[in-house]
C-alpha cells in the first residue's frame, strides 16, 4: 500500500482510488477473531456478517450484526477475511475466496466510492450513478507508464497495460467492456478513448482542406469527438439506462511504430432502427430528435419546418420526452461541434439535419380509406410537402409512390392500390431505412476522416456492445443483443478457463484440468446452428406464405422438449404475450416473435426508393444509390443477367456475418476484460442489492477467474527474455565467458534468488509465475538497478574528486616552486656578478640557438611532409566515408523495402490465418450438421419406439384431460368472479387516490410559499458567510501550497541534475556500443574476405574434381574400346585358327589324293608349292598379329596401371585438401559462434540502454513540465496572496456587521421543528441542482478545483445553518416581526455589498483571463519540449534502425555461411562419389577374371536345380505308386463284391423257388397292402411337400449366402491363397459326392426292397396260418421301419442338398483353379479312368443287388454304412462350414480393419488440413507397415495351409495302410456299430432341430401378426391423439376468448 504522499499525484481523485494510510493502520489494529467472525447465508440479504455463538451437530448458531440469531448448516457459514483485507484492490489476494467475501469487498469499496476493483486478471467496475473526479487530466498523467501493481485499480490502468503490451509484445490488443444494460460500458469506453488520445498524441495538427471552410481538429480531437456524434444518433433512454447504446461498436485505434496515434476506425453492429418509429412507455427515441427540438439552435427549427414540442411528432413521443440526467441543449452544441471537428462539409451537415427532420415529419403522414373502396388516399398534403421539401422530392410523386406503388407482374409493371395499414407500414419502413442508412454513412465518413494514411503497425480495439437486456417486451433486437453478449461471455470463458489450462498442458506443467462449468455452447448452438432459431427464421423468410404462427410452430416442433435452453413461457397477467423463452447465462428471457419475419426481410417500397435515388439532395441519393429496385433489376437482367437472389440478404444473416468477423478480430488480439456491474435497479448512488450483484458475478465468471488466477500461473515470460531482463538480480549465478542454455540459466537464476520456489514453474519455452511474483521480481530489479547506479555514481564522483585533488596538489607544488625561484632572484638581482651574467648569457646562447634553428627547420620540413601525407590520407578517408555513406543509405533503403515486404507478408499471413479460421469454422459447421442429422435420426427412431409406449398412456391422458377440462371450467367461473370483485376494489382505490393527490397538491403549494420566503433570506446570509470562510481558507491554503511548491522545486532541481548525469552516462555507453559495433563490422569484413578465399579454393577443388571425373570417364571409355578390340582380335584369331585347320585338312586330303593318284603333273606340283607358300605366309601373318595383340595388351595394361596410380595420388591429394577444409570449417564455426555471442551481448546491452534512455527522457520531460507548472503556480500564488490579504480586512469588517444580523435571524427559527424533514429533502434536491450548475460552470472555465472547494465549503455552512434552524424553534414570532422591520433598513446595505461583490467578481474574471494567457504560453513551451522529446525519440529510432540493419547483415552473413557450408558438403559428397566411381572402376577391371567363376557358380546352381527336378520326379513316381496301391485296394474290394454276388445269386435262386410257392397267397392280401400303400404314399407326399418347402427356404438362404460369398470373393484377392488349400479337399469332395449319390440310390432301392420284404413276410404269415392280430403287428412294424427308412431318406436328401450347396460354393473356386488342377492332375488321368471303370462295375453289381430280396440284413448293413458315410460327410460338411465361418469372421475382421483404416484415413485428411504433409507421410508409412504386416500374415497363413495339406496327405497314406491291414477289420466293424449309434443320436437331434425350427417359424409368424396389429393400434391411437390435440386447442382458444 502506497503512502498518502505517493497518492498526492492523483489530486482530488486520491480518496476515490485508494484508502488512506490512516484508514489502513486502523484496519490493521482493529480487533478481529478469525474463528468466530463469519458471513452467514440469510434469505433477504443473501449474506450478512455475524459472530459464531455455538456449534452443535453440524449446525452453527450465529449472531448477526443487526442482533438477530440464526441457526444454519455448516456449509452456509463462510469465514471472514482479516481486517487488513478490507477494501482490497485485487480480490485474488484474499485469504478466503468465496461469494460473500467478494460481495462485501465490492460493497465496502463502492460505499467509499472506489468503483474499480481488480479480480485476478481482469477488472470489475460498479456503476456509481453519480459524477466522480476520477477521470481528471492529472489522473491520466498519474497512470501513464505505471505498472498494474504500482497504481490503484482504474480503467486507465487497464488501458495503459494494453498500450504497454502492444509496444513490448508487438501484438494487437483489445479491451472488452461487457456487462448488462446500464452497467456503465459506454462511459468506460469514452474514458479509454480519452486516455489513448491523451497519452499517444501525434503532435501534428491536421491540415485544413481548402474546399471546406470548416474547423477541423487534430486526430485525437476527432477520435474524442466521434463519440458525441454517434451517441446522439445511436443512444437512447431505456428502462434501465438513460444513455443506452442501441448499437454495438468496435473502435480500433491504430498506432505507428513509435507508439503514436496513426489513425482509427469504427465498426458498428445492429443499430436498433425499430426505435425510430416505436418506443415503450418508460423509454424514448434517439437523443438527436430531442436535441433538435430543445430550441438551442432556433435556425434548425426554421430550416426543418418543425416545432419545439416533441408531442407534435408521434414517432418520437410514444414514451418519455425528457431525461433528468441529460441536458439536450448542451448536447446539441456538442453534437454540432463534433460534426464540424470531424470534417463534415456544410452541405453534408445540413443534409443530416434535413433527413432527421424528414423522419420526424414521416410520423405525421396521415392516410384515409376511399369511400366504398379498400384503397388508401392521402388525408392532407401539408406534412407530405414538408417531408418532400426536406428530401428535395416532389410531394405529389411521393404520395403517389406510397399509395400506388408500381409492382412487376410477369414482364410488365402495373400500379397497385394499397390499404391504409400497408401504406402506414411502408412509411415506417422508409423512415427506419433512411435513418439506418444515414447512420451507417456517417460512420463511413468518420472512418474516412480518421484514416490519416500514416504508417500504422498495431491497434488497440475497444468493444462497446449493447448490454444484456431483459425487458417486458423482448423482440428480435433483444435476441441479437443477448446472443452477442452470450458469444462474448463464451469467448471470455474460453480464453480465461480453457486456453489458459491448455497452455499449461502444452508447456508440460503439472496441472489437473479444472472444469468450471461455464460452457455456453448449448444456448449458442440453439440460436445459430443449422435448424436453430436464426436458421428457421431465415428459412421462413424464403417462403412467401410464411407467417409468425408458422414460424412459432416450427420452433416448437424443432426445439420444444428437445433443448433444455428452449422453453414455452407461462402466460403472466398484465404482461405482453411471450411466445418462447431462452435460458441465457444472465437469466431467462421471454421473446415475442410478432413481426420478426418483416423485420428480418426488411422490405421497402421500390417506387419510393427510386424517387430517393433521383433526389436533388445528394446525400439522400447517395444513401440509396446501392439499392436495387425491381425495375433496375429487370434492366440488369436484360443486360448482364444478374441472379435474382444474389442481393437478398436477411438482417439476421448480415448480423451473424458481422458477429463472426468481430469474433475473428477478437481471437487475433490479446484481450483485456472489464466487467461492468449494476449495483441496483433504481439507479440510486451508493446502494447495492446483494442478490442482483451476486447473479452478475456468477454469470460473468468472476469467482472462477479469481480461482484460475490464484491456482494457475497468469504471468509468463520466455527464457531468453527472462535471462536478459533479470540477470542483474544475481549476475554470479550465470557464469561469464561460456555458453549456457537460457532455460538452465533461468533455473539457476531463480534458484539463487530468495523467493518461494512453489510460486513458479518451468515450461518447455517459458517460465510461469503465480500472480504477483513478477511484480516482486520487478521491484527487486528496480532496487538492484538503483543500488548499482548509486555505486557507479559514487565511484565516478570519487574518481573525479581524486583527479581534481591531484591537480590541486600539482598546482600547489608548482606555486611553491615559482615563489621559491622568485625570492631567490629578488635576492641576487642587484648583485654585480649577476648583472654580468645577464649580459654574457645571451651571447653564449646565440650559437646554440642557431643550431636549434637548423634542427627546428628540419623538423618543420618533416612535419610539413607528414602533414601532406596525412592530408592525402584524410582525403582518401573522406572518399571512403562518402562511399560508406552511400552504402549505408542503400542499406537503409533495403531495410525499408524489406520492412515493407515483411509487413505485406504479415498481412498475407493474417489473411491466411483468417481464411484458415473460416475454413475451420466451415468444417466445424459441416461436422456439426452431420452430428445434428445423426441426432435427428436417433430422435426419429426414439420417437418410433416411444409411440408404442405412448399409445397406452394416451388413453389415460384422454381421461385425465376430460377431468381437467371440467376442473378448468369451474376455476374459470371462480376467476371471473374474482376479477369482478378486484375491478370494483380498484375503482374505489382510484377515487381515494384522486382525493389524496388533491390534498397533497394544496399542502405542497402552501408549503412552497413559506419555503420561498425563507430561502431568499438564507441565500443572502449564506453568500456573506461563504465569502468570509472562503477567503480565510484560501489564505491558509496558499501559504501551505507555497511552502510545498518551494520544497518540490528543490527536489525537482536535484532530480533534474541527477537525470542529466544519467543521460550523459547513457550517451557515453551508446558511444561505446557504436565503437564495438564498428569493430564487429571490421571483423565481419575480415570474415567475408576469408569466406571469399575459401569459396575460391572450393571452386578450384570443384574444377579439379570435375577434371578428374572427366579423366575417369575417358579412361573408362578407353578401357571399353580396348576390351572391344581384344574381343575383335580374339574373334579374328579364332577365325584364323579355323582357316588354318581347314587348310591343313585340305592339305592332308590333297596329299592323300596325290599319294593315291601315285603321280602328278608339274602343274599340280607348282600349285602345291604356291599353296604351301601362301599357307606359310598366312601362318607368319597370324603369328605377327598375335605378337601385335600381345604388345597392345601389355601397353594397355601398363597405361591402365599408370592411370590407376595417378587416380590414387589424386585421391590422396583430395583427402589432404578435405582435411584442411574441415580444419578451416571448424575454425570458422568457432569464430562464428564467438561473433554470435558478441552480437547477442551487444544487442542486449543496446536494448537495455535504449530502455534506460527512453525512461530517462520521459522522466526529464515530465520533470521539466512539472517544474514549469510549479514555477507558474508559485508566481500566481504570490500575486494572489498579496491581493487577498488586502481584501481580507474589508471582508472581516463586513462579516462583523453581518454576524449581528445572523444572530438575530438564528433566534427566530424555533417554530419550524415540525417542517425540518421536508426542508432537508428540498435542501438536498437544491444541493443536487447546485452541484450540476457548479459542474457546468467548472467545465466552461477550466477552473474546477478552486470552485469545487468553495462549493463544498458552502455545503458545510449550509449544514451549520440547518443545525441552527433546528435549535431556533421558540423565536419564530420575533423573527417575523424583526425581519419585516430590519429587512427594509438593510436593503440598501445589501445592495452596496452586492455591487462590491460584482466588482470583485469582475476582477477575478480578469485574473482568470490572465491565468489562461499564462496557461497558453506554458502550453506552447510544453509543445516545444514535446517536439524536442520527439526529435530525441527519432534519433533513438534511427539508432534502432541502424542496429536492425546490422542485425540483418549478420543474418545475411549467416545465410551466406550456411550456403557455403551446404556447397562444401555437396563437394564433399561429390568427392566421395568420385572415390566410389574409382573403386567401381577398379572392381570392373577384375570382372573378366570373375566371369569364369560366375559361370562355375551357374553350373552348380543348374546342378542343384537338376537335383530338385529329380526330387520332384521321384515324388511324382511315389504318387503313381500310391495310385497303384489304390488300384490294388479297389481290386480287393472287387473280389469281395464278386463273392457277395455269388452268395446273393444262390440266395436269389432259393428266393425264386419260395416266391413261386407263395405267389398265390399274395393275391389275397394285395388289397390290404394297396390301402397301406396309399396311406404311406399320402404321408410321403406330405413329407415331400414339407421337404420341398424347406428346400426352397434353404435355397433362398443358400442364394443369399452365395451372393455374400461372391461379394467376398470379388472384394478380396486374398481368396486366391485359400484356393490352394481347397485343391486337395475338392478332389475328396468329388469322391464323397459321387459316393453320397450312390448311397442315395442304394437307399431308394432299399426302400423298394423293403416293400418286397413286406410282401414276403405277409406270405410267410399266411402260410404259418397265424392270426390276423400277428399280421397287423408285423404290418405296424413294417410301417415303423418304412418311416425310419423314409426319415433316413430325408436325411440323405438333406445331406445331398447340403453337399450340393457346398459343391456350388466350391464350383466358383474350381473354375478359378481349374487350369492349375488340370496341370497338376495330367499324370493322374489314367488312375481316374480306372477308377471310373471300377465305379461302373460297382454300379452294375449294385443294380444286380436290387433284385435280391432275402438279403435284407446285408442291405440294412449297407444302409448303415451309407449312414456312417453320410455322417462323415456331415462332419466334413461341418468342417467346411467352420472354414466358411472362419472366412466370414476373417471377412468381418478385414471389413473392420478397412473401416478402421478408412476412419484413420479420414482423421489423417483432417489432420492434413492442420498438420500438413509430414502427418500424411507418417500415416502413409504406418499404412505401408500395416500392409506389410498383413502380407506377412497372409504368407504365414499360406505356409500353414501348405503344411496342413502335407499333413493331410500323410494322414491319408496312413489310413490306406490301416485299411490294407486285415487284422483291423474287426476293430473297424466295432467302430461302425458305434458310428451307427451316433447316427441315431444325430437323427434325434435333427428331428428336434426341425421341431424347434417349426416352433420358431410359428412364433415368428405369430409375432409378425402381433406387430402388424400393434402398428394398426398405433395408427389408430395417433389419429385419436391428433383429434384430442385439435380438441384441446379449440378448448384453449375458447377459454382464452372467454377470458
UniProtKB/Swiss-Prot annotation:
The rodlike tail sequence is highly repetitive, showing cycles of a 28-residue repeat pattern composed of 4 heptapeptides, characteristic for alpha-helical coiled coils. Limited proteolysis of myosin heavy chain produces 1 light meromyosin (LMM) and 1 heavy meromyosin (HMM). HMM can be further cleaved into 2 globular subfragments (S1) and 1 rod-shaped subfragment (S2). It comes from the Eukaryota. The keyword Phosphoprotein applies. GO terms for cellular component: cytoplasm; myofibril; myosin filament; myosin II complex. Residues 86-782 form the Myosin motor domain. The modification Phosphotyrosine is found at residues 389, 1464, 1492. The modification Phosphoserine is found at residues 392, 625, 1092, 1096, 1162, 1237, 1243, 1261, 1288, 1292, 1303, 1306, 1474, 1495, 1514, 1542, 1554, 1574, 1600, 1603, 1714, 1726, 1739. It comes from Sus scrofa (Pig). The modification Pros-methylhistidine is found at residue 757. Belongs to the TRAFAC class myosin-kinesin ATPase superfamily. Myosin family. Residues 33-82 form the Myosin N-terminal SH3-like domain. ATP binds at residues 179-186. GO terms for molecular function: actin filament binding; ATP binding; calmodulin binding; microfilament motor activity. GO terms for biological process: muscle contraction. Myosins are actin-based motor molecules with ATPase activity essential for muscle contraction. Pfam families: Myosin_head (PF00063), Myosin_N (PF02736), Myosin_tail_1 (PF01576). Muscle myosin is a hexameric protein that consists of 2 heavy chain subunits (MHC), 2 alkali light chain subunits (MLC) and 2 regulatory light chain subunits (MLC-2). Interacts with GCSAM. Residues 1128-1147 have a biased composition (Basic and acidic residues). Residues 659-681, 761-775 are annotated as: Actin-binding. This is Myosin-2. Keywords: Actin-binding, ATP-binding, Calmodulin-binding, Coiled coil, Cytoplasm, Methylation, Motor protein, Muscle protein, Myosin, Nucleotide-binding, Phosphoprotein, Thick filament. The modification Phosphothreonine is found at residues 64, 69, 419, 1241, 1255, 1286, 1467, 1501, 1517, 1730, 1736. Residues 843-1939 form a coiled coil.
